[in-house]
Amino acid sequence: MSRTMIKNDLKQTDFTEAGEPFRLFAEWLRDAEQSEPNDPNATALATVDPEGMPNVRMVLLKGFDEQGFVFYTNFESAKGQEILSSMKAAMCFHWKSLRRQVRVRGPVEKVTDEEANAYYASRPRGSRIGAWASKQSRPLEGRFALEKAVAEYTAKYAVGEIPRPDYWSGFRIKPVSIEFWHDRPFRLHDRILFERESGGLWTKTRLYP
């Protein structure tokens, strides 16, 4: 039996023994890191614009704990502006190799400057230059304009540290609900919904597929 087949043989006790969602998410993410061909931390991030039109795109999860799920972006981008307008978002992880999915919904907060600085400093130098060079989501007259901006900022920051732009930071989704989904034959899937109560405790409900 292959490793993927073993991982897919998820038993009901795997859900019922989980008293809270974060440990279960950590286990599933570790499994994905072993089975997904690339970017196991990729997630579809959903936002809404001021007119109520939804928007979705892939981002990379850069951290999580009981406080929430963290990703980084340009605050002047479309997603940055939409989040700043509503301060709400949702994300969906789908690991095809494991036939598993996790949905997260909740209000959003900015990460601290200390968190943003630490993560920004850990990025490759080229990515830090890119944060300055790219006017994310705005019209680009041609690839040459982007390459020119990269060259200019590369020269500007040729020596020393590259500071983090004020407009580049991170968001944390503070989940009010986290749903775990596992594929079953004949579409009789397992779905477990965790919902956070006002006191911070989690309730757990099994849902029809």
From Swiss-Prot:
One GO BP: pyridoxine biosynthetic process
Chain sites annotated for binding substrate: 62, 119, 123, 127, 187-189
EC number: 1.4.3.5
Keywords in alphabetical order: Flavoprotein, FMN, Oxidoreductase, Pyridoxine biosynthesis
InterPro entries assigned: Pyridox_Oxase (IPR000659), Pyridox_Oxase_CS (IPR019740), Pyridox_Oxase_N (IPR011576), Pyridoxamine_oxidase_dimer_C (IPR019576), Split_barrel_FMN-bd (IPR012349)
Cofactors (names): FMN
GO molecular-function terms, A-Z: FMN binding; pyridoxamine phosphate oxidase activity
Catalytic activity: pyridoxamine 5'-phosphate + O2 + H2O = pyridoxal 5'-phosphate + H2O2 + NH4(+); pyridoxine 5'-phosphate + O2 = pyridoxal 5'-phosphate + H2O2
Pfam family, one: PNPOx_N
Cofactor binding description: Binds 1 FMN per subunit.
Similarity comment: Belongs to the pyridoxamine 5'-phosphate oxidase family.
HAMAP family: PdxH (MF_01629)
Subunit description: Homodimer.
Protein name, per record: Pyridoxine/pyridoxamine 5'-phosphate oxidase
Phylogenetic placement of the source organism: Bacteria, Pseudomonadati, Pseudomonadota, Alphaproteobacteria, Hyphomicrobiales
